[in-house]
Amino acid sequence: AGKYFEATDKNFQTEILDSDKAVLVDFWASWCGPCMMLGPVIEQLADDYEGKAIIAKLNVDENPNIAGQYGIRSIPTMLIIKGGKVVDQMVGALPKNMIAKKIDEHIG
């Protein structure tokens, strides 16, 4: 089964920005209700896109530098990063098919 990647301030550059695959990063926190609702969706996406894209989660409380760098104000916010640049942004606990459609636009 695919597993989402646990992004941190420390590994963000090497694992996310330097990745040759498209990366979905879910900015979340444990106290955020909608983030918790999105959790299982992120896990399903990690399964669906195994080998095709990287699905990552970043805890904003534990990794304030990256969250600040990207100006994350409300969570959950999902960024799609490709070639080190943000190519798409989504805010809120969106349905899986909407998120998948966005990822599909940036892979291949």
From Swiss-Prot:
Participates in various redox reactions through the reversible oxidation of its active center dithiol to a disulfide and catalyzes dithiol-disulfide exchange reactions. Disulfide bonds join 32-35. One of its GO terms (cellular component) is cytosol. The keyword Electron transport applies. Signal peptide: none annotated. Keywords: Disulfide bond, Electron transport, Redox-active center, Transport. It comes from the Bacteria. GO terms for biological process: cell redox homeostasis. It comes from Chlorobaculum thiosulfatiphilum. Transmembrane segments: none annotated. Gene3D superfamilies: Glutaredoxin. One of its GO terms (molecular function) is protein-disulfide reductase activity. Residues 2-108 form the Thioredoxin domain. Belongs to the thioredoxin family. This is Thioredoxin. The keyword Signal does not apply.
